[in-house]
Amino acid sequence: DRKFMLKDFDKFMSQLKETNQTLDFFCDFDKISQNVEDIKLSLCMLNSLIGASDLRKSVETIWNRDKNAFSVMDILVAVRTRDKKKILDSVGNCVPLESMFTSVDSVMTFLTETGLGEVLQSQKVKNLVDYVFGIETGLDTNARKNRSGHVMENTVANILTNAGISFRQEVYSREWS
């Protein structure tokens, strides 16, 4: 009966809280700190680019010492390596972003075309470790959305379970087409 269903739905809706967020919900600082710690040595090497009067020479110095330091540069533009991002190169070819870290020339192209070289040379950033901590905090907002969704899923699941109502945790749209 439709009237009975509406009454139950209204009761269900009245039991939901305005929010499901506690203070520990906003940022997972343990995860953020670990992500930064994992690349800290490379970031410290890249710190020498900050304020460099001859950016290319500074890049060459790092390259000759440890070219792997550049493999973390994607995070400086808020991209994670595991996302396997692709970009269009200067001639329109679709290439992996990580290919920008395979030579001094490609690193220079990355620094120039992203604007990051100017940011570093003009010292708009003072320390890449702190800068990446901020980026990681920003990237954690997507994880926050996922955390919020999971908390709400569990809240609704508990309400339905306690009411003895059978349900499926997830239903995919392809099942309805």
Residue ranges and their predicted role:
Residues 1-126, 139:
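Nuclease-adjacent, charged terminal/linker segments that flank catalytic cores
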Residues 125-129, 161-163:
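Generic structural motif recognizing short loop/turn segments at the entrances and edges of beta-strands
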Residues 129-144:
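A short, surface-exposed helix-loop junction/capping segment
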Residues 130-133, 151-154, 174:
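Terminal, low-complexity, charged helical segments
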Residues 141-155:
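N-terminal, charge-rich interaction modules
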Residues 161-177:
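A short acidic/basic microdomain associated with nuclease active sites
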